[in-house]
Amino acid sequence: WVDGVQKRRKLMDLKEYFDNTNGIGVLSTADSDGKVDAAIYARPHFTDEGTLAFIMRDRLTHHNLQSNPHALFLFKEDGPGYKGKRLFLTKVREEQDTELLESLRRRQYINEKDEAKFLVFFQLDKELPLIGGGKK
């Protein structure tokens, strides 16, 4: 029970951090053969069920997650220096073209192609600072 409360508190702290911090994010994945990919992604969405979620199209990142559920989200804060976070993630589920996905979208594009969109949910395995190994 305590562990669940601590995890929820950690996610709430992360939500507040991302709500109040501008920067650039990169989501890195690898396929089942270990071939890696990195792509620019917006800040994660945080769910009531204690997961993080990203909206993605059916491109290489989504493809990689079908055979390897592990990912890393690297976030570098705007400004001088190297402040930010690394979030180690494991995919737990996804949904396609749902009302929830549409409600979470931060941007709408006028000339957007009618392609499938996926809301991919992750559990947070570990959080580290952008630089260094964190507290020991």
Where are these regions (language model features)?
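Binding-site signature for planar aromatic cofactors or substrates
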Residues: G4-K136
